[in-house]
């Protein structure tokens, strides 16, 4: 999906669920890390995180669009647009939009080291020079076995 398709989807979702036009811009912002989208109060534009579209699909992404459009329409109408406001919570329920986003799984590389003497195994996120360090248990020489990618739920 590109910027033009995002804009078109945002306008369609606004008309379908809110029966109101979306008159501002919707753009992708790949720098967003822990949030699915962001409504900008001054410009009235909406920024969307493209990683949520890649990881969770279009149906979930439309839910995030509905959430951001709740902020948008309530702010334009000068009603309570913040998460804690009653108007916002009621509109979320009415259009069946999520209140919070799921976290995107993060990819972490783990490096595995083993002691030549005692065979103890170590997992570390950072690589280190095996010639400079020794086993903490027996003082033996360490060798790097390899590295593997692990997906975590933390953001």
From Swiss-Prot:
Q: Which cofactor does it need?
A: Zn(2+)
Name the InterPro entries on file.
SprT-like_domain, SprT_Zn_ribbon, Uncharacterised_SprT-like
UniProt keyword annotation of Zinc present: yes
Q: What is its main location?
A: cytoplasm
Entry's Pfam families? SprT-like, Zn_ribbon_SprT
Q: Which GO terms describe its molecular function?
A: zinc ion binding
Query: Active site at which residues?
Result: 68
Domain of life, per UniProt, equals Bacteria
Positions bound to Zn(2+) = 67, 71
Q: How is the cofactor bound?
A: Binds 1 zinc ion.
**Where is this protein localized, as stated in its record?**
Cytoplasm
Q: Which residues form the SprT-like domain?
A: 7-145
Descriptive protein name:
Protein SprT-like
What's a single GO BP term from this record?
A: response to stress
Q: Please provide the record's keywords in A-Z order.
A: Cytoplasm, Metal-binding, Zinc
| Example of a GO cellular component annotation carried by this entry | cytoplasm
Give the protein family: Belongs to the SprT family.
Entry-linked SMART domains: SprT
């Amino acid at each position: 999906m590109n910027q033009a398709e995002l804009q078109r989807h945002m306008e369609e979702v606004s008309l379908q669920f809110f029966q109101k036009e979306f008159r501002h811009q919707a753009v992708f912002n790949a720098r967003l890390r822990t949030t699915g989208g962001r409504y900008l109060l001054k410009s009235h534009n909406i920024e969307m995180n493209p990683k949520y579209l890649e990881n969770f699909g279009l149906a979930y992404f439309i839910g995030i669009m509905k959430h951001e459009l709740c902020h948008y329409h309530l702010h334009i109408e000068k009603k309570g647009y913040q998460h804690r406001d009653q108007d916002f919570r009621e509109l979320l329920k009415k259009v069946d939009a999520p209140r919070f986003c799921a976290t995107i799984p993060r990819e972490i590389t783990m490096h595995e080291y083993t002691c030549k003497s005692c065979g103890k195994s170590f997992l570390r996120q950072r690589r280190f020079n095996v010639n400079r360090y020794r086993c903490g248990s027996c003082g033996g020489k360490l060798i790097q076995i390899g590295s593997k990618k692990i997906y975590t739920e933390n953001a």
